[in-house]
Amino acid sequence: MFRRRSILPALLAAALAPALLPQSAVQRPAITGVARIALKTNDLAAARRFYGHDLGFAEVPGPGAVFKVNDHQYIELYPQLKSEDEDRLINVAYETTDAKQLRDYLAAHSIEVPAAVAKQWDGNLAFSVKDPEGREIAFVQYLSDSQTGRQSGKSLPATAISARIIHTGFIVQDRAAEDRFYRDILGFEEMWHGGKTEDSVDWLDMRVPDGNDWLEYMLNVRNPTPKTRGVMNHLALGVPNMEAANQRLIDRAATLTEKPKIGRDGKWQLNLYDPNLTRVELMEPKPVQTPCCSPMKPPR
């Protein structure tokens, strides 16, 4: 009995060790970019037409409908939408070089984390946390022996409208709280901010610490309708030439409700909407005009 009682406290202490470490004892591993965005739909067939036919991405095996943008980025659709009032965004995931170390790092910074990092359906290591506004944010470490690793270089058809998700965005109500999480703890940095007027801040681009993808805070949004949430909670696909991308969509008879335009950030963009109103923004990565409101940091 004595031995059993003496061992249990030691085992408990070992299990809790990551959470008890001082902040400086665990270094943040690299966070290199957007890994995936997961969305709700109530019509997988319509989603497949939009992401597979109109946008030209290849569907790969997985739950729901999974579309491959490149070897490190995916768009996932799940038939979970039960009401038009629901938010379509399930989560956004970022790629890290070490999921376990990142989990321990977040625990050391008093972020609630799962008990352990686990392999997901695709064989990669991943875990999720909640940001200060309750949004699910995931982190993925790609493994060479996973389903995605074994499919490296495959399912990348010439029909794809884009080769990269360059950013995702969602509604932010409390910028200071979100900054404490994304900037102060995770290491994201402001790349550009702009607004509908020169002195307003309606959009804030926060670049990942070890890459060029970014998160766009969508600020000053009050009581959004389902359509407004779809506009704000969005993803952006980089295209090298907007005119060519627009023509490809026309040739595929895609539903186009808007025309290409130059945004406040000086970049060509074209807004598309999937069957459940989530905005998919096509964007040329480089400004063709001087961005409004603030200087834009150049790519790393």
Locations of regions flagged by a protein language model:
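Core segments of cupin and vicinal oxygen chelate
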Residues: P29, A35-I75, D122-L125, G169-L215, ...
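Conserved short beta-strand elements that form part of the metal-binding/catalytic scaffold
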Residues: F57-L89, E136-S144, M191-R229, L272-Y273, ...
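Short amphipathic beta-strand starts and helix->beta connectors
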Residues: Q23, E76-L77, E112, Q151-K154, ...
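Residue-level signal for alpha-helical transmembrane segments in multi-pass membrane proteins
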Residues: L12-A19
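Sec-exported extracytoplasmic/periplasmic mature domains
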Residues: G52, G56, D98, A107-I111, ...
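N-terminal targeting signals for export/organelle localization
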Residues: A10-L11, I75
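Vicinal oxygen chelate
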Residues: F2, S6-I7, L16, S24-R28, T32-N42, A65-K68, L81-A107, L125-K130, ...
